[in-house]
Amino acid sequence: MNTSFDIYELNNAVLDAAKTIKDMRNDFTVDSKDAVVDLVTNADLKAEEILIEAITKYFSEDGIISEESDEVLSSNGRSWLIDPLDGTVNYANNIPQVAITLTLLVNKVPVQTYVYDIFQDDLYEGYADKGAYKNSEKLQVTKETSLQKAIIATGFPYDRLEFGEQYLQTFLSILKTTGGVRRFGSAALDGCWGADNKFDA
């Protein structure tokens, strides 16, 4: 990683969680949550444990909202939104588009977001008051104004088995009116790559 968090206490925790995810890449167990295609691995759970432990240690009054655990209520209006492994299906299939995400909410409003691209070793930071950065360098979104030329990133929700036909109709309309569609399996990285001018929307 080429930079540190503004909230530096969590820097080592993110690196430790990322190392754990890498180390477990060829030795993990998989379970399904609400849907057959909504997976969780023991790597998700171990990475989450590392992040929650660090937040509890350094920011004991902050709340924690994590994908795999019960919510910890805040006593000061600050909460951390955690996804310890965004792109679990990718991870389970040895596709290296996965990320750790941390978002700081103040009075339920996001003010800072950190996304660590584990296998590319890139840190994306977003701030409500000063924009987005990749490895400390300011990002510039696309200047493309033509929808017909725009490259769009998208994904399908986990309830696609129930609403698949509706999603396909929407997807078809996007295909017909844009320059192309890409789907990489990590919503967090899709957003970061949009901020980094890899996608137009």
Where are these regions (language model features)?
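Generic detector of well-ordered alpha-helical packing
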Residues: L45, E49, E68, P84-G87, ...
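N-terminal subdomain of lithium-sensitive/metallo-dependent phosphomonoesterases centered on the IMPase/IPPase/PAP
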Residues: M1-L85, Q169
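Residue-level signal for inorganic ion chemistry
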Residues: I21, D44, I55, T88, ...
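Short, solvent-exposed loop/turn motifs
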Residues: P110, K138-Q140
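An extended, acidic
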Residues: Q140-A201
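Solvent-exposed alpha-helices and their adjacent loops that cap or buttress functional pockets
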Residues: S32, V72-S74, N107, K143-S146
